[in-house]
Amino acid sequence: MIEERIPTNNYESVQGSITPSGFFGNSVDMIVELENFMTEEEQEFLFNFASNNTTWDYTISKKNENGTVIYDANIWEDRVATLHTLQKINPKVIDVVQKMFDRLKVKVDEFYNVDAMATSPAIVRWPVGTRQEPHADKELHEGPDAGKPNAFPYYDIASIFYINDDYEGGELYFPLQGIEFKPKARAAYFFPGDMNFIH
């Protein structure tokens, strides 16, 4: 199997954060699960795509003005396909995910009393042995740069769709809220992206 990489600047954006850190508080009640959000047809289509795709984004790491890494490309190498890549290899994925975004927006807007704007779609695979340390989606959460923007300052509210759950491990862990759970296949999850919700 030959894998292809498409150069992508998925962290370049003119859009900054629209909510300050802490805007949503730190309550566990701000972490939302929507079971069976994805249809069986969406699940099957996206699972088949993610299982068979061999073309992934190619990005480079980025540091802030203090030399702190705000995006580590090594973590995501050969396992993320974002808008630019999806447009080239299978635009139908974009359509399917956009319909899911549209349905989720209604729930997010209602829950947080906001007018959320979706970022572009991304398909992420987690091969055996991969993991990610607790982090905030929109900002750095530790060290001298804690609270400063990372490469995605516009990730005010994070949302994740889980295509499958037939694997060991993979728990979603929120250390500050003291909760850990295994995400369910076809479920959607959303929560604030600031350092009060490292995961």
Q: Where are the model-predicted features located?
A:
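Non-heme Fe(II)/2-oxoglutarate
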Residues: I2-F111
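Catalytic core of non-heme Fe(II) oxygenases with the double-stranded beta-helix
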Residues: I94-H199
